[in-house]
Amino acid sequence: MGRGAILKFIFSLVWLMAVASPAFAADGQANAGANDPRMNQLYAVGGEQTCLKCHNSPPVNLILQTPMAVKGDLHSPFGQQGCESCHGPSADHAAGKMTPDGKLILPPILFKKPLIEGYDVSPVDKRNEVCLSCHQAGLRMNWQGSEMQKAGVACADCHTSHAAKDPVLVKATQPDKCFTCHAQQRAESFEYSHHPIREGKVVCSDCHNPHGSPAADHLLKEFTVNETCYNCHAEKRGPMLWEHQPVRENCLNCHTPHGSNEAHLMKERMNFLCSSCHSDTSTRNGSGGAFGGRGSIPYHSATGNSAFNSALANPRQCLNCHSQIHGSNSPAGAFFFR
């Protein structure tokens, strides 16, 4: 192909693009208009501006201070159909139309119970469906079938979209939101030994994922209790040369997570907790038990139980010798000595 033929081909291609582009653009605009919900008569003319003519005071208009009101973001409600992105088509409501029995027509999706008598909040599944149409990845991927979902909890029961800062997403206010339902955990947070929740150093979502969890219990962020605890208590992870089996099985064998009146979040006084596995018999006569045949040592006399009774009298007596209770790399580690 000669130089002249190549130039002729390029000129023809440019001419076709110049002619076709306006036609394609016009067709695209026509299709966009047909698919634009604002052209649908079910949606309010003027969008969110129509809504804000009446709903112009807190807490409703506080949504204007949130990322949800960024019109330039096509992933935000205001970048799509505004208020109707979440509340559904509301042209009849905006026009003040009434039902046959004389009641004002409200938007199809109501996240909170209206102040007007005779109306109720929308069903949980309808409300959650709206939220999950955008928020379904990441921490929410296990929502379906989760404990919260099965209990009929709605996203709006915890979250507040019409607020500059959602209380459940702010560390200072998140626990109070959780404690409105979890009263037992709230009471435990005031006990002598507790995780620093009230001090603002730990929040519920540091350990739990309320949207669902792959773990069997407790809506944990990790697969097991221990893996969750090790996120902060990494020094207890191991592996150790000498392992303490109850520790490896589950931290909750000895500790309670939210609060305790015993030191170190222990489930009960340390000496009684130890003796629940290391009984008088097993520690004195070497018959096996928790020590696996290594119980007949000088401190736990086989001729009497005075030493054992002394241990029971002092809450921390066991740790005077067996201080490395989470595991040890010491040559004397079989008994978790110092």
Where are these regions (language model features)?
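Bacterial N-terminal signal peptides
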Residues: 8-21
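N-terminal secretory signal peptides that target proteins for export/translocation
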Residues: 1-7
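Short sequence/structural segments immediately N-terminal
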Residues: 22-338
